[in-house]
């Protein structure tokens, strides 16, 4: 119900207890969208965000949501996009009577949607996207809107923390791979130096030429050389 304060309290409590490492960033986004439906009278929810540099419905609770949103992404106009761009709340009480986004309105009406509510998601001064709620009935009154804004503010903090966490994890993984690559390359250079009496630069250039000739990454060529020596060493020891 629109005045279901216990549901809102439950949703906010669930957000505050959310463990970022419980899943992927996509799982975090989806959980936020699902909670938004639980604390509001919306029939479905989606989150507009940048995907590969372009606005898109990154997650949704119903496959109809991205089908509705595609009209605004194609035309560049719609409540979800405007909420994202301008960091303002946009509410449509009656799709049939709203003339601001005609293409979006036609698509929403075709899916039986009567009302929508788009709320910006921002934290630490950064625009993260927009939370979009859809209903087949005119249920987004002022109280629902205010409650949804409270939820969106808390959700934005969760999403921002999740983004920071997963960015840090990715950076750590990239650094780990870089260190492994550097180690393999250094070992391969040492092997080539010992094998042919080459200088460090000559050994490195040999790796580079092999990488270019075979159209493979330098670290993969190096790892193959190191693995080959390890296999020969193991066979000799056996």
What residue spans do the PLM features occupy?
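Helix-loop-beta substructure at the N-terminus of cytosolic sensory domains
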Residues: 2-13, 17-60, 69, 77, ...
């Amino acid at each position: 119900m629109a005045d279901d304060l216990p549901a809102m309290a439950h949703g906010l409590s669930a957000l505050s207890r959310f463990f970022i490492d419980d899943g992927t960033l996509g799982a975090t986004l989806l959980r936020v969208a699902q909670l938004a439906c639980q604390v509001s009278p919306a029939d479905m929810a989606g989150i507009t965000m940048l995907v590969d540099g372009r606005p898109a419905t990154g997650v949704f609770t119903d496959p109809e949501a991205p089908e509705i949103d595609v009209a605004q992404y194609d035309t560049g106009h719609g409540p979800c996009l405007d909420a994202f761009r301008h960091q303002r709340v946009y509410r449509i009480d009656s799709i049939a009577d709203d003339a601001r986004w005609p293409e979006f309105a036609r698509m929403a009406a075709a899916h039986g949607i009567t009302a929508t509510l788009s709320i910006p998601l921002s934290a630490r001064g950064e625009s993260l996207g927009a939370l979009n709620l859809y209903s087949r009935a005119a249920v987004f009154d002022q109280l629902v809107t205010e409650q949804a804004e409270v939820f969106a503010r808390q959700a934005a903090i969760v999403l921002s923390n999740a983004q920071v966490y997963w960015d840090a994890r990715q950076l750590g993984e990239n650094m780990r791979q870089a260190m492994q690559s550097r180690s393999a390359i250094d070992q391969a250079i040492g092997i080539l130096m010992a094998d042919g009496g080459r200088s460090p630069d000559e050994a490195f250039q040999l790796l580079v030429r092999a990488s270019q000739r075979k159209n493979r990454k330098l670290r993969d060529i190096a790892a193959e050389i190191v693995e080959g020596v390890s296999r020969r060493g193991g066979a000799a020891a056996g």
